Amino acid sequence: MDTVETLEGKINRSDYKILIVDDVVSNVLLLKILLTNEKFQVCTANNGTACIEMARKEHPDLILLDVMMPDMNGFDTATVLKKEEGTKDIPIIFLTALNTPQDLVHGFQVGASDFLTKPFNKEELVMRVTQQISLVAAKRIIEKQNQELLATLTNRDKMYSVIAHDLRSPMA
């Protein structure tokens, strides 16, 4: 638990973008106000198709996705997002009035990272969003450390190659 608290303390929320997707304008506005007050960057879409386009264009760090929308529902939208290389790793929190075990299972099967049931509690929303953003931040740290480690290993191998060459052909 200390590691998560420490990581959350290091997170600059303004570095993270959240895509809010809901066909009900009042829900979008409420979520936008809540998350901008928490210092997150926010972009919005009002349907599944617009969500997919916005995710491709904006590369959000998290998507809050309504399930019950006309044309393309949230489950179908998530399925498309999880199949595309550029969007497959974006965590998705479903916002839904659906709360049966079958709905939850289906949501996780199509790629949900978490669920929030409508009507949602503000504090719970902020905590779940912060938790997902913490995981995104941790993943970024791990990826950066892996790149640094690979660079170190490459340099080490070059150094070993030079040493081996020098040992095979000493100066006269």
What do the PLM-derived regions correspond to, one by one?
Residues 25-43, 57:
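Two-component/phosphorelay signaling modules centered on CheY-like receiver
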Residues 58-67:
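Active-site beta3 strand of CheY-like receiver
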Residues 1-19:
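Non-catalytic signal-transmission and effector/linker regions of two-component phosphorelay proteins
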